[in-house]
Regions:
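Signature of extracytoplasmic/envelope-associated structural regions
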Residues: 1-290
C-alpha cells in the first residue's frame, strides 16, 4: 500500500502517555454556520451559529490498568493525539485535540474474549494537526511515553456479584457497563475586541447525577424473573459488583461497585436448540459529594 499510513505505524497518546490495546480511533468536528440572506439577492455571507466543538471515540482492549476510567469525574481537561508515519518516509503527521472531556465510558465483556472499552470525548478546544510539539512526538518511543505494562485479565481473574443471582446455577455469559458523564460548557462574552480566549468556554461542568447502567446476560437454570407491577409497590434493588484483575497478579484493572442498584428491565428468550437466557439491566445514580 504505497503512501498509506498503516495501523502499526500509528500511536495514540493521552496527556503524553501512550495507550495500549487501542483498536480504533475516530475524531471529527463540524462547524455550525448559518447563511445570511438578503431580500432581492439571496445568500451574501455566513455567520457562526454555535460554539465550535468536536468529538473523539476511542475503542481499546483492556489489557492493563485503564487510565481513562479516572477521567469520568471532575477532572481537568486532557489532550490526546494520534501520530502516524507515511509508509517509506520519515515524515510524521498527527491529528489531535486539547481541552477534551470524557462523556461516556463503556465496558463490555463476553465469555472467551478480552474486555473491551469504548470512551466518548467531547472536545471544547482545538482539533487538528500540529497540536503537540515536535519534541513531544520525537520522544514517542521513550520509556516514559510508552505504556509497556501488559497484564490482560482472564476469565478466572474477573468476578461479578449480584445479590439476586445464584451464579453456581445461573451463568453470566456477558456484561455491559456504562458510565454517562454529561458535560455543560459555559461561555462568557469577550471583555475586549482582542480577547482571544472568548472562543473557548470559561469552564466545563460535570452534570450530576452521574448515571451508571449495568446489563447482565444469563444462561438460567432456576432464576425467577420479577413481576412488572411489583415496581408500583417497591422497585427491586440490590448490589452489583464487577471486579476485573490482571492475570499475572492481583492488580485491579477496573472495578465497579453499584450499591442498591435499581433493576429497571428484564427480558427472557429461548429458541430451538438453544438455552433459556435472561437479560437484566440495573441503574445507579451518583450524586455530587458534599
Amino acid at each position: 500500500m504505497k503512501s498509506a499510513s498503516l495501523s502499526y505505524e500509528q500511536n495514540f497518546y493521552v496527556n503524553g502517555t501512550g495507550l495500549s490495546g487501542v483498536q480504533s480511533i475516530n475524531g471529527s468536528y463540524g462547524i455550525p454556520e448559518r447563511p445570511i440572506n438578503i431580500l432581492g439577492h439571496g445568500y451574501v455571507n455566513h455567520i457562526l451559529d454555535g460554539p465550535l466543538q468536536g468529538d473523539f471515540t476511542i475503542s481499546r482492549v483492556l489489557i492493563n490498568q485503564d487510565a481513562m476510567l479516572n477521567m469520568t469525574g471532575e477532572n481537568a481537561a486532557f489532550s490526546g493525539v494520534v501520530s502516524y508515519n507515511t509508509y517509506g518516509s520519515s515524515n510524521t503527521g498527527s491529528f489531535g485535540f486539547y481541552s477534551g472531556y470524557l462523556t461516556s465510558y463503556k465496558l463490555s465483556c463476553d465469555v472467551g474474549s478480552l474486555p473491551e472499552v469504548s470512551t466518548d470525548i467531547s472536545v471544547y478546544g482545538d482539533i487538528g494537526p500540529n497540536l503537540v510539539s515536535a519534541s513531544e512526538l520525537a520522544g514517542k518511543d521513550s520509556d516514559s511515553a510508552v505504556d509497556n505494562t501488559i497484564n490482560p485479565p482472564n476469565q478466572g481473574s474477573m468476578t461479578i456479584y449480584c445479590d439476586e443471582l445464584n451464579t453456581a446455577s445461573n451463568r453470566i455469559v456477558a456484561l455491559n457497563h456504562e458510565i454517562a458523564c454529561q458535560r455543560e460548557a459555559i461561555y462568557a462574552l469577550p471583555t475586549s475586541a482582542s480577547d482571544a480566549q472568548a472562543k473557548y468556554p470559561v469552564q466545563v461542568d460535570l452534570v450530576y447525577p452521574l448515571e451508571q447502567t449495568t446489563s447482565l446476560s444469563l444462561e438460567i437454570d432456576d432464576y425467577q424473573t420479577k413481576n412488572l407491577y411489583d415496581y408500583l409497590t417497591g422497585v427491586y434493588t440490590g448490589n452489583v459488583n464487577i471486579d476485573i484483575n490482571g492475570s499475572s497478579n492481583d492488580a485491579t484493572l477496573a472495578s465497579f461497585h453499584l450499591d442498591n442498584a435499581r433493576l429497571v428491565s428484564e427480558s427472557f428468550s429461548s429458541s430451538v436448540g438453544g438455552v433459556a437466557t435472561v437479560n437484566m439491566t440495573f441503574k445507579k445514580y451518583i450524586n455530587k459529594r458534599r
